[in-house]
Structures are given as structure tokens and as C-alpha cells.
């Protein structure tokens, strides 16, 4: 059976998949597929929202790289719902001991 080669620390939901990789300096990478969001305006809006959520909630506290993969249902979320989703994902990673 095929086993995907995923990093040790990750969180998956129907809206996003969040990976954490130890690295220096801290960074945030966001991937929004053109397949799911045809217009560049929509892709850029989602990226701006995610960056703002990480910045406001001070989620990049330590060393490491966060990689966020965005799925189609994320585009339908309100800003507050998206914020709650991302904060929960990062908190679950911190609880796993990153």
C-alpha cells in the first residue's frame, strides 16, 4: 500500500493541510492551487488572509517553516472562521510537541 512521505508534524482538515518543518529562520509558505481558485485575485486574497492571521495571532513564534496547502472549501469561509481554523491547526501542532 502507498504511504505518502509526509513530514512528522502536520495537521489536516477539509480546508487546509499545515506542515511544520524545523528550519532557520522562521518562515511561512502558502500554496493555493490554480486548479481550485481560477482567478489570481482570489488566490492572492487567500494568501493575504492567511499571512494576516499568522501575524495577528503571533503563530510563528519559534524556529521553523510552516507550509500551508489550501483546499477549495477554504475560499468559502468567512475571515473569522478561517482564523479559527488556522489557529486550531497550529495549536494542534504545538500540542504534538514541535
Task: Show where each model-derived region lies.
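Positively charged, solvent-exposed patches that mediate nucleic-acid binding
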Residues: 1-98
Amino acid at each position: 500500500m502507498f504511504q505518502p512521505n509526509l513530514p512528522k508534524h502536520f495537521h489536516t482538515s477539509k480546508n487546509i493541510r499545515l506542515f511544520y518543518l524545523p528550519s532557520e529562520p522562521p518562515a511561512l509558505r502558502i500554496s493555493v492551487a490554480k486548479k481550485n481558485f481560477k482567478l489570481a485575485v482570489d488566490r492572492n486574497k487567500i494568501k493575504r488572509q492567511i499571512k494576516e492571521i499568522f501575524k495577528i495571532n503571533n503563530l510563528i513564534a519559534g524556529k521553523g517553516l510552516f507550509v500551508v496547502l489550501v483546499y477549495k472549501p477554504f475560499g468559502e469561509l468567512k475571515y473569522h472562521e478561517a482564523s479559527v481554523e488556522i489557529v486550531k491547526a497550529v495549536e494542534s501542532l504545538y500540542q504534538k510537541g514541535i
